[in-house]
């Protein structure tokens, strides 16, 4: 069940070892070449030397969605979506990421599945 999986932990390798985080605390992940930066609750950032594709597969059964070639987001932290060509997402912490035109339709579909809409 997806909720139980969100309580699981993820090991993120760092330069000097690794750190363990609750999956539920991950707000979003951002690709930077062959590195991925994790944005975690309480303004924490962790850079790992694995690609975003790797983490997209690892988190595929959870409420994470790829909204752009550079962005994998936890939909539980989305505050609002501003439409446009692709549009962009605003998170609870005030940060923003673009949604690509190609990913927009699937993103909106998944949001409606995971949240009650009016």
Each language-model region and where it sits:
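Conserved binding/recognition cores within well-folded domains
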Residues: 1-92, 96-98
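A cross-family signal for key residues in well-ordered alpha-helices
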Residues: 56, 108-109
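Short, Lys/Arg-enriched C-terminal cap helix and immediately downstream tail that follows
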Residues: 100-104
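General helical structural elements
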Residues: 32, 107-108
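Short, charged, intrinsically disordered terminal tails
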Residues: 109-118
């Amino acid at each position: 069940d997806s909720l139980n999986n969100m309580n699981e932990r993820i090991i993120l390798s760092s330069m000097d070892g690794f750190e363990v985080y609750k999956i539920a605390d991950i707000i979003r992940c951002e690709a930077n070449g062959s590195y991925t930066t994790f944005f975690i609750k309480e303004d924490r950032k962790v850079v790992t030397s694995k690609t975003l594709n790797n983490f997209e597969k690892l988190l595929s059964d959870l409420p994470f969605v790829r909204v752009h070639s550079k962005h994998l987001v936890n939909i539980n932290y989305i505050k609002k979506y501003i439409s446009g060509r692709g549009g962009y997402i605003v998170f609870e912490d005030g940060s923003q990421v673009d949604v690509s035109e190609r990913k927009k339709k699937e993103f909106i579909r998944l949001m409606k599945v995971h949240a009650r809409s009016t």
